[in-house]
Amino acid sequence: MGRIITLLIVFLASIASKSLANTPNQDTDVKGKVVNQDNQPVASASVYLMSASANVLIKSAVTDDQGNYVIIKAPKGSYYIEVTSVGYSQGKSAVFELGDNTYQVEDIKLTSSSQAIEAVTVQGQLPLVQNVNGKLVLNVENSAVAAGNNALEVIKRAPGVSVDKDDNLQLMGQQGVNVTIDGRQTFMTGDQLANFLKSTDGSQIKSVEVSTTRTAKDDAEGAVGTINIVLKKNRTEGFNGTFVASAAHGKYPRGNTSLNLNYKKNNTTLFGSYGYTNEKQLNELDLDREIENAGVTKYFSQKADMLEKSQNHNYRVGIEQKTSEMNTMLFQVSGNNYMEDSENSSVTNIGFTPTSVDTILRSPTTADMGLKRMSLNFNNEYKIDTLGAKLTLDLDWSMFKNRSNMDYRYRTENPSGNLFYPEELERSNMPTDIDIYVGKLDYVKPFKKGTLEAGLKYSNVKSDNNMLFEKMEDDVWENVLTRSNHFVYTEQISAGYLDYSKAFGKWNAKVGVRAEYTISDGHSITADTKVKRDYLDFFPSVNIGYNMNENHVLSLSYAKKVSRPNYRFLNPFRYYIDKLTYQLGNPYVNPQYTHGFTLNYTLKQMFNFTLGTDITNDAMVESMGQDAETNTTWVTRENLGKSLTSYLNMNIPLRVGNVWSMNNNITGIYMHFKGPIAGYEIDQGSFFVQANSMHTFKFSPQWSAEAAINGNTPFVYNLFKIHARIGVDVGATYNFKDQKSSLKLAVTDAFRSNRNNLSTDFHEFQSKIRQYHDNQTVRLTYTYKFGNLKQQIRKKDSNNEEKDRAAN
């Protein structure tokens, strides 16, 4: 692996040494002016650079007080300019060819509209999926299918993203995804992350960015890549807001509502939002198991219906202050309060043949859970000069308080309903407190022939989990010491990075290294044991790009990444899922390190193809075990063997006529694992396909419709065979003529086919799992915009146009 890294760096250096200092850059600027019919400048008009061949939006800008605009660093090609402004009809330039020199567009004259409206419909709106700076971006702001859903449901629709039976996010078929919000790390994985995303209002999301590569500036966490959730931001002058109300019905009714407010005057912007969700849903689980003991096989057939009722309040409030022409400050507070009550009616039939029943285990469980989250963020961006040098400071504090109380009742009966043993009563109380402190400083310095980026970051995480488990003995609750546990985990990461990028002719390159020093301490207070670690890691990254012309762009990248275990996986404790199944913590499980290689090809600025390979040694995998004496099954995490995953992701947008546009994302994945699992050596590979096809039909300015189809073919993942899955979502949108309100109707999982079915057939491990979340719903969402709805005025960093376009 070190040899490959060395070859990449040598290749980069050889290219740089052969480059001529005076080689012209491929990217050039487009300038122009927008005037009205009296030749007076039109300020704050939105200007769009459109590809003439593909008719898609490439870049954007806003005119200044004199009506002038500059679109910087546009690649060579054929384009035209499209202009919109409040009170004017749409303007358009002639098609022009952009070469090596700055192009001056003839003045575009706008005529007053006889039916001036307060908002303008932009014909060059962002496509549903686009490739921005090597990231696949899902734009969901106006999606009927995504409207009214939570963040987890929105993310599931992003290219290359899937969710397993436990709601763990996967990217290109792999776990180990780093989820960020507006570029800030959440520091959560597993069920903590899933519950957090379920409690996050999807109507606050503008887009979802998916990336399988990283630079030295990015956190090394996330072995397979990063999913960044970009929240909506509105910086329109004056007062404005948006009200959203959504009602849905699955097995039971559910609904949510939200209010977003924004006020901007001169250099001060105040913003805030509040959302409320009330849901009731039924999740179904069927589990069949076989356990052999002394040549005798027992069959267990479990059916569980889990009724969940939840409420969630989420909020965000903040202020952005431009203190000078060179400095901007931002302070915001966000959080949510999530409450859930659940009832699990589980029945397990036990017999010595698959059809006979000798024993029935009834284990109804009730639970109430609460999750409180609060985050404070301070950001200060100082522009050192007008050439792009800047210094950015980020300070974050986040607090999570998770409360979970469960009551268990076990009845072991014969088929006639008579008890074999006295009824058992148990209960648990599991509070978890997490505090996260993060400080980050980033510096950017452009030079004549390149750009230097450097930064420092410090994070401190403390997780305190105090599990109390009790059992009723002689009408008195007694503490079960073997199942109670107090575990405190602290982790400090100090990081620094250097990145240098350079463009020479048709070539560009970025090389960097990130260092992370980690100190961790896992302390089981109950067992009086500690596992301390401290280690220094270096994470190199290299990216080499070649812009052949506007139709052909290639890039090759390498990065070393890491996935750290969930805090709960490190807790040396048995976490019981039911009486016969538990998760076993492993305090000695180590982070896994992944070497990722990607080759990316973009055709005609539309079609994107990514070929990638991830190699992981000492892979952190899920292992299983069984106790034939007690009929229990346990699951744990261990560092076992080596995994290799190769994938080809193809993102293909197409347009059929003027009405129908689609985006097809197809990923072919090969996963191979070699190593011991559950006491047996495995050396196996599996190929499968994930696909997501989204279709938009624009019938008129008022009417549009959507359809989304997603699924995967069968594949093998460690001990599990994952069965094929398919889901179909449809929706329609009606925009009222006042341009302020809209109505969206959506049907999710229209054919009730989006199921999680899997099985194991591995030596003594024989099981079948059939799982269905309450996915099939009909949802109606109403949106109303009020206040000043004029075009948003945005002053953008001249070196980051496309990123701003995707993130604002």
Please tell me what each predicted stretch does.
Residues 151, 157, 185-212:
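Short acidic/polar hinge/loop motifs at secondary-structure boundaries
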Residues 52-68:
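Short, acidic Ser/Thr/Gly-rich low-complexity loop/linker segments typical of extracellular
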Residues 107-109, 151-154, 193-196, 210, ...:
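N-terminal periplasmic accessory domains that precede
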Residues 35, 40, 46-50, 84-89, ...:
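Short, acidic, small-residue-rich periplasmic hinge/interaction motif at the N-terminus
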Residues 485-491, 562-610, 615, 635-646, ...:
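Outer-membrane beta-barrel signature, preferentially recognizing the C-terminal barrel domain
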Residues 303, 436-440, 480-485, 596, ...:
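Outer membrane beta-barrel strand-and-loop segments of large Gram-negative receptors
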Residues 3, 314-338, 365-523, 547, ...:
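Face-selective signature of the C-terminal outer-membrane beta-barrel domain
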Residues 519-521, 550-596, 611-630, 750-763:
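Surface-exposed extracellular loop regions of Gram-negative outer-membrane beta-barrel proteins
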